[in-house]
Amino acid sequence: MNPSEMQRKAPPRRRRHCNRAPLTHKMNKMVTSEEEMKLPSTKKAEPLTWAQLKKLTQLATKCLENTKVTQTPESMLLAALMIVSMVSAGVTNSSKETATIENGP
């Protein structure tokens, strides 16, 4: 190889993108009002009682113990969210505790 062939060639230049304003324009046209975002199936829920919150904490603790996960604030939050999502999705569980949190104390 001669020295001119050994020189490294510059990579081809990237093409510049055209103005991305049309995408921004589409985003501005999106519906952003809260009333228009609500689905007809949105339901009002009663606030949690302290008893329900205590039961949720107990279920989350038991879930972490069963899975042998260290009990940290982060893992407790994730366990509680898992339980709430299972109850709201209607996942059937043989545990009476899940039914208690679903129906109240």
Curated annotation (Swiss-Prot):
Top-rank taxon: Eukaryota
Molecular-function GO term, any one: RNA binding
Subcellular location: Cytoplasm; Nucleus, Nucleolus
Record keywords, A-Z: Cytoplasm, ERV, mRNA transport, Nucleus, RNA-binding, Transport, Transposable element
GO CC terms: cytoplasm; nucleolus
Residue ranges with Basic residues bias: 10-19
Key word Nucleus present: yes
Residue positions of motif Nuclear localization signal: 13-20
Signal peptide positions (record): none
GO BP field: mRNA transport
Extra remark beyond the main annotation: Despite functional similarity, Rec shares almost no sequence homology with HIV-1 Rev and HTLV-1 Rex. This Rec protein is encoded by a human specific provirus.
Subunit structure: Forms homodimers, homotrimers, and homotetramers via a C-terminal domain. Associates with XPO1 and with ZNF145.
Protein name: Endogenous retrovirus group K member 104 Rec protein
Organism: Homo sapiens (Human)
Chain's gene name: HERV-K104
